[in-house]
Every structure is written in structure tokens, then in C-alpha cells.
């Protein structure tokens, strides 16, 4: 009887999405810290997405792989799918209206994938105007068709956009029109092999202090995406970094000499955040509502705030991908992570 119950418990535990390890997609830049992190932990990564390529408004693709990274990926059996990035609003608009430029872009992606053994490419098109929503969808569909016909995959990173419209004027309107409004998740999901939902940068240098990816905000954006994207095609963004808010020196108008406030914020890695906490003897606290690590300290008699991803913050969002049965998680960016995360993640190769 005991053995039978154990077997039943094992079967329940191992239903897909309950105890299966989510697919681990990690982004990598060309910074030494990022490359070193991949070289040290390649055996725990399912898919490497490096920031090697860019495209301009004429469809000209520029970039090249890192040979050491490619050799290490091959040694460990890690598939490589580089980003193809474009962050310029007008340049993307021009590209979306130019079929010949899109054809050049698609031909270049197929050429590079064949030449270097990539599994495909990931589009990272940001700062796209909301009026180019249909244009973005059309570009993605054409590129997906071209890559699929050649035997390669196309994925896309999308800015989280719940509830799908601005909830007010000011910041809400700006972030919708300039960042969130261009992604038609339902249509994009029909074309691509995977959507990486960038559920991070809730608070940034543009905002007051707060979590990089608060729990309720993450849930709202995940639920919004899951309403139109199959869970097997959705990867949850988990940030590996944080932000550091502080008071900057006043801005001074060069003409009038008038001073204005300068609240400032910088991007910060988890190890650097932990170093500041140690340096200023600041206890790292846990925000039970937003389920994230944070702390504050005083320097020059002024309070400074840091919200960042430690192991607990990461682990709770990793568990969320399991609970929802998602394809996996996607984390920006290697080299910024709490080192303890690697003891938690399972070996894949």
C-alpha cells in the first residue's frame, strides 16, 4: 500500500508543469562579466540568446558571433539563438514599410544561421510606436515564414502590455504609445515559436523607487498574455538585476542658471547591490507584497534605495513558471545574477 501511494504521489508530482524543470533561456551581452558567466554555467542553460546582431531601416544586418562562446556552446550542447535588435522608432517604421528591406533582413538571418549553426533568431524590437502595431505583426509574420521555410526558428521578446490600453495621461499614456502598445500578442503567437515576455522594468530610472518586477504586476501581465498565447509558447521574463535610486546634483539650466531637482537611478547587478548592503551595513529586506528583495541606506545624509533580484526573488518567479506550466523563463542578463542562483538551477547538459 505504501509503495502504491508513493507511485501515485510521484505521478501527480511529475505532471507537466508541476515538477518539470522550466526551459532556461539566458540572455548574454558582450561584457566580460556576461561572457564569463556563460562560460562558467553553460551546463545549466537550455538556450543562449546573445546580443550579437542589429538591423537598420534598410534591412542591413550587422554583427558576428563570439568564437569562444560558440565553441563552449557546442561543447555543452547549448543551442544559440542570437538577438536581432532595433530600438529606433523611425527606423523601425521605415523598415515596416519597405518589403525589399525586410527581404534583405530575412536573407541575412538565414545566411547567418546556416553559416554559424544557430537554431534561429530572436527579434528584440523596442521603442516601437503603437501606431506601428500592425506593421510589427506583418514584419514578424514574413520573417517567421522565411526562417521556418529554411528550417530555423523565430522567437520574439515583447514588452508586457496589460491591460492593453493606457489607464491615464502622463506616464501611463507615454509608456503605452512608445513602448507597450505595439505588441499584438495573439497574432504574434500564431507566427513565432516562442514569446519571451519581458516582465521586468516595472520601475526604472524613469520612475520613483520600487520593484523591478513586482509580484502582482507580474501576475497581471502573465495572465493577460496567457489569455491569448498558448502556455507552451510563453517564457516568463525574470530579471537578474536591480535599480539603485539616489539624489543627484541639481540640474542647472545653461541659459538661465535656474536649478531643478535631479532624482537619479542607475542599473545595478545583484552582486553590486549586495556589496553596497554590506558596505553600509544595510539589512536586505523582503517586500511581502511585491515579493522582492530591497534595502535602503544613507550616504551624505541622504537615503538611497535599491530593489534587486536575489535568490529568493528569482526562486519565487521560477516556481511561478512551473505552477503555470509555461515553456520556461527568460532572464536578462548573464553576469548580473546573484551567484546563489546557480546552486538552485538544475544541470541540463
For the regions a language model picked out, list residue spans one by one.
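A cross-domain feature marking catalytic cores of carbohydrate-active enzymes
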Residues: 28, 52, 82-86, 125-127, ...
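Short, acidic/polar
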Residues: 28-42, 98-114, 176-188, 309-322
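Conserved, mostly hydrophobic/aromatic
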Residues: 48, 123, 195, 236, ...
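Glycan-binding loop/region signatures in secreted carbohydrate-active enzymes
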Residues: 240-319, 341, 349
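The substrate-binding groove and active-site-proximal loops of carbohydrate-active enzymes
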Residues: 93-99, 125-133, 206-213, 304-307
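Substrate-binding surface in catalytic domains of secreted glycosidases
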Residues: 57-60, 129-275
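Glycan-recognition patch characteristic of GH18 chitinases/ENGases
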Residues: 21-109
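Sec-dependent N-terminal signal peptides
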Residues: 4-13
Amino acid at each position: 500500500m505504501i509503495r502504491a501511494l508513493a507511485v501515485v504521489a510521484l505521478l501527480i508530482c511529475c505532471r507537466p508543469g508541476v515538477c518539470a524543470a522550466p526551459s532556461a533561456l539566458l540572455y548574454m551581452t558582450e561584457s566580460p562579466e556576461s561572457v564569463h558567466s556563460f562560460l562558467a554555467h553553460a551546463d545549466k542553460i537550455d538556450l543562449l540568446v546573445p546580443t550579437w546582431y542589429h538591423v537598420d531601416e534598410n534591412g542591413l544586418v550587422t554583427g558576428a558571433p563570439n568564437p569562444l562562446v560558440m565553441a563552449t556552446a557546442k561543447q555543452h550542447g547549448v543551442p544559440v539563438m542570437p538577438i536581432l535588435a532595433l530600438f529606433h522608432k523611425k527606423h523601425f517604421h521605415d523598415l515596416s514599410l519597405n518589403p525589399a528591406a525586410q527581404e534583405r533582413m530575412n536573407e541575412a538571418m538565414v545566411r547567418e544561421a546556416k553559416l554559424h549553426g544557430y537554431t534561429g533568431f530572436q527579434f528584440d524590437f523596442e521603442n516601437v510606436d503603437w501606431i506601428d502595431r500592425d506593421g510589427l505583426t506583418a514584419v514578424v509574420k514574413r520573417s517567421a515564414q522565411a526562417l521556418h521555410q529554411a528550417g530555423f526558428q523565430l522567437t520574439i521578446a515583447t514588452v508586457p502590455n496589460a491591460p492593453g490600453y493606457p489607464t491615464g495621461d502622463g506616464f501611463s499614456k507615454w509608456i503605452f504609445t512608445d513602448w507597450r502598445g505595439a505588441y499584438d500578442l495573439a497574432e504574434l503567437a500564431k507566427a513565432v515559436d516562442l514569446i519571451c515576455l519581458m516582465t521586468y522594468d516595472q520601475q526604472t530610472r524613469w520612475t520613483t523607487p520600487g520593484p523591478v518586477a513586482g509580484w502582482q504586476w507580474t501576475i497581471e501581465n502573465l495572465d493577460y498574455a496567457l489569455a491569448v498565447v498558448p502556455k507552451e509558447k510563453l517564457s516568463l521574463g525574470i530579471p537578474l538585476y536591480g535599480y539603485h535610486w539616489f539624489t543627484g546634483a541639481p540640474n542647472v539650466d545653461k541659459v538661465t542658471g535656474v536649478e531643478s531637482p535631479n532624482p537619479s537611478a542607475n542599473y545595478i547587478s545583484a552582486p553590486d547591490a549586495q556589496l553596497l548592503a554590506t558596505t553600509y551595513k544595510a539589512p536586505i529586506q523582503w517586500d511581502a507584497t511585491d515579493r522582492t528583495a530591497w534595502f535602503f541606506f544613507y550616504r551624505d545624509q541622504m537615503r538611497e534605495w535599491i530593489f534587486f533580484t536575489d535568490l529568493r526573488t528569482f526562486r519565487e518567479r521560477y516556481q511561478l513558471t512551473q505552477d503555470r506550466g509555461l515553456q520556461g523563463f527568460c532572464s536578462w542578463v548573464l553576469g548580473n545574477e546573484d551567484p546563489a542562483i546557480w546552486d538552485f538551477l538544475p544541470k541540463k547538459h
